[in-house]
Amino acid sequence: MKSSKLLSLAGASVLALTLAACGSGGGSSESSSAAPAPTDASSSAAESSSAAPAPAGNEVVKKVAFFGFWKTNSFTQAVLKGVEAGAAEIGAEVLDLSPAEYDAAAQIKAVQDQTIKGDAQLYVMLASDSVGMATAAKEAIDAGITVVAAFTPLGADFTTLEPQVPGLAVVGETPVSNGAILAELAAEACADLNPCNVAYLEGFKALPLDNARTEAFVSTLAAANPNAKLVAQVEGGYSPDSGKKAAQDALQANPDINVMVGSSQAILGAETVVDPAKVKLVGNGASCEAFEAVTAGKWYALYNLDTVSMGYESVILGSEIANGGTPAMVVNSQELRDPKGTADVIASYECAYSDLG
């Protein structure tokens, strides 16, 4: 979801999920079935945006504070575009309070400072540390601020989207559901091949979040296709270099691999050492590089996450809550579009961020 500076273990569990989907540079625009996306593909995340008069139905939210992973991160910028689109619709201003670089502690402090000194009525956050941010979110909610967690739920339980902080809203997904979709894609890539040898390039073995995703992948694969055989489970990480090495190790031990799954960054590296005519590749991420690879037939599929709509839906849901509505407090981002990003599925969409910067 990277540059080497991201490999700090501060906030490591959610960093792994961040890396599974994020690039480090600027992004391009995304077409979304669930939300209007801003049209300026080259614009970076703005410090603030001007707002139109509040339409009927929003009397409370005048300012939305956005806390992304870091300002120049292209995944953050893609989500911010959706936040800005939603804010424009409800007539609110957007304040981008993302840290300058990946820094979970600085991100939490920015939330706490805004709660104490700021004047935003709605927070949308991409938490770098889901456990630490849960505390900051509770403080904001206790102060009367509406808080929406985008992309990842807040708290230590990786199996549920249900809010682990009372009053919190969530627009996102769990690593468990992500792992299950990846396994289903692998099973579909296997088709009728018997046996079908599958290699899984997991993220970081030391991280609980990655372990939860891996466990979901393994159990779902076994149930989805009885002919699928997991012959390699190697740490692939979140860079092309680590993915290339993992693919080489997997192939050396198991030369007859038919399907290989890993982070989109790892699969970018793996594609340089596998024969795409023999090995079907699945990347966990919807980066521009992944889109290009699937469209060109180099990869079987990608994980099709709707980043722009995630930001948009966070603002719309938050505004409804802030104005006294009683909507469902959870939006599953896997329902914003079909997450199984085969070539036919992604044909009507455009990418929104880069894995390479």
Feature roles, as predicted:
Residues 126-142, 217, 231-293:
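Hydrophobic alpha-helical
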Residues 75-90, 178-182, 208-228, 246, ...:
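Short, solvent-exposed amphipathic alpha-helices that sit
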Residues 55-57, 61-86, 95-112, 126-131, ...:
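Extracytoplasmic "Venus flytrap"
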Residues 137-177, 287-295, 300:
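Flexible loop/hinge segments that line or gate small-molecule binding clefts
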Residues 22-35:
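Bacterial lipoprotein signal-peptidase II cleavage site
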Residues 107, 168-197, 243, 286-290, ...:
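Hydrophobic alpha-helical segments within soluble ligand-binding/sensing domains
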Residues 11, 52-62, 201, 205, ...:
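Hinge/cleft segment of the Venus flytrap/periplasmic-binding protein
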Residues 65-68, 118-128, 146-151, 200, ...:
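Periplasmic-binding protein-like
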